[in-house]
Amino acid sequence: MDTMNWLDQLKWDAQGLVPVIAQEAATGDVLMFAWMNREALAKTAELGRAVYYSRSRGKLWFKGEESGHVQQVHDIRLDCDSDVVLLKVTQLGHEPGIACHTGRHSCFFNALQNGAWQAVDPVLKDPESIYK
């Protein structure tokens, strides 16, 4: 694989990042949104495991490094404008199916109902017991 060539085809933002959506391969559920830099995307392709870039920590974030909730990557796709990446993943871990740091399946658990945001998906595991 010509690493430089395929990475150069993305439209990186001014900070050298690209937005990434993680989607559960089996169900199509959108699990989370994160960012990647070149190194994170190259590592993800190399390892077959999601590696993101943490803007708050300023470093690579190997999904599941603290929680054990790893994402096995089956497919990496680029949108038509070459500025958004889609990962099709299987969410693995001690409690398979937890992608969100809140202990939920998806980070998109709030729904707008009657003019207010309501949590509509259950907490599968207390986050305090995940992050010790």
Swiss-Prot record:
The protein's required cofactors: Mg(2+); Zn(2+)
Enzyme class: hydrolase
Pathway: Amino-acid biosynthesis; L-histidine biosynthesis; L-histidine from 5-phospho-alpha-D-ribose 1-diphosphate: step 3/9
GO cellular component, one term: cytoplasm
Gene3D superfamilies: Phosphoribosyl-AMP cyclohydrolase
Binding site residues for Mg(2+): D79, D81, D83
Keyword Cytoplasm annotated: yes
Subunit description: Homodimer.
Name of this chain's protein: Phosphoribosyl-AMP cyclohydrolase
Organism in which the protein naturally occurs: Acidovorax ebreus (strain TPSY)
Organism phylogeny: Bacteria, Pseudomonadati, Pseudomonadota, Betaproteobacteria, Burkholderiales
